[in-house]
Amino acid sequence: MPARHIHTIARPANRVVIVGAGLSGLSAALHLRGTGADVTIVERASAPGGRVGAYEGPGGSYRIDSGATVLTMPGLIDEALAAVGSDRARTGLVIRQLAPAYHGRFADGTTIDVHSDPEAMEHEVRRACGAAEATRYRELRAWLGAMFDTEYDRFIAANFDSPLDLANSPSAFRDMARLIALGGFSRLGKQVAKRIEDPRLRRIFTFQALYAGMPPARALGVYGAIAHMDTSLGVYFPDGGMHRITEALAAALIEAGGSIHYNTEITGLEHSGSTITAATTAEGHRIPGDAFILTGDLPITDQLLARTPARIPRRATRWSPSAFILHGTIPQSVTGLWDAQAHHTIDFGDAWDSTFEQLTARRGKGTVMSDPSLLITRPTLTSPAMVADGATGPRELLSVLAPAPNLVSAPLAWDALEPSYQAELLGTLERRGYKGISEHFAVDHVDSPRTWAAQGMAAGTPFSAAHSFPQTGPFRRRNLVRGVDNVVLAGCGTTPGVGVPTTMISGRLAAQRITGAP
């Protein structure tokens, strides 16, 4: 795709200050450092990570991912490392593809493995659903791939200055026309249902809409691109855990001459007219810069911008659903008896559309899922070195994620609800065949909407603004801040949106707003 002109900050910038050492901040820093910029990251936590961090078990007995567990498009990590002449080998980062990407279990007792290899997946669909559905799977895969290929360069991995950018040239117009012809602005659930008949496969190829904060029945067809990433491009996992990604990116930045200040919270921005001149810390220290990238959650970012000339958008935001997550360990002698032996297992409840309505209901109308679909993640199966020692034998790491309504949809008293809901979920898994999980799963960390709200995340969700049409593409919160000359946003609240790949891209797009590089 030909490079198009984009607006950049108003003046050249050699010194760039980045607030936040998560994926977007580190991605931006590496791309900027690769152009010779003097880059400083300021991070309030004691280590890099953000939404890709880690918890420590009791006494430091293990480390388990505290955020994202699904990695797709690892080439974006390579791209960021390459910006400063580094690579995975240099940083000690080892990434392995999962096979299967997911193991799907259904309420009727059947299972379907999800493979990125087309032949392997076709064989699995034929086994589980019959020959006719295997043929239809190939048609669906082609449609998902066409959707991804049509939108990626122009609509995902590019900066927008205006909705007019969607059709501001003959090539852009052609891409938009093709996106419309593919059904990109109809509903994802409807488009998938046109191509495959088995309700289990429909779930496998549409549940990813929840990553974008939308039920499959209401998500736009363009979000078939997420399903393509998940089911065709492959799911991966780094040795040692997802947090190894941010550790590797941070190490590459330091080696390239960048700097990171940990345990340092930015609480203000100084300005002269419309130019931000320095970030100020909670201790009162000044960190001057020529340009600033803010990667925090939107409420925190807007609080920083509130005392500057920045024009903060006032329109109401619709927030994504949240999550309730249990982290801990369980004896391998228990898990070894389970039928499911996969890194990621999606254990689908019988209900489907009704559970999404519970999760995404309007203000005050939401509830927890009455028949939950759950993500069970067992990283030790892929990275055995992560195993924890137990008094009676080795214990594997285990995370159980239940989608949950956000605090706007359902202002639940999670402090009181957490113990009973934890017991309810473990009881559900016990009945579904995960024998011993109620008794033997030592839960060391519980995350709920209360957790995310305490960290400054709006509506108590780590998934930020939902990808409804008014919050998608050029209609999403713009990364170039109006009213000030030299501030750019990055992270899941701005373009292109939520997810590990898109957050990495947002960092690169923020860097481009400073350098003007394509």
Q: Where on the chain are the PLM-derived regions?
A:
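Mid-domain catalytic core of redox enzymes
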Residues: 267-390
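Helical element adjacent to the flavin cofactor pocket in flavoenzyme catalytic cores
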Residues: 225-276
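Extreme N-terminal leader/targeting segments of oxidoreductases
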Residues: 1-16, 34-35, 468-472
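FAD-dependent oxidoreductase catalytic-site/capping-region signature
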Residues: 375-467
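A glycine-rich dinucleotide-binding beta-alpha-beta segment and adjacent secondary-structure elements
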Residues: 198-212, 369-375, 435-496
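A conserved FAD-binding loop/helix module that cradles the flavin
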Residues: 68, 492-515
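Rossmann-like flavin
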Residues: 107-218
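N-terminal glycine-rich phosphate/pyrophosphate-binding loop and immediately adjacent elements
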Residues: 10-153
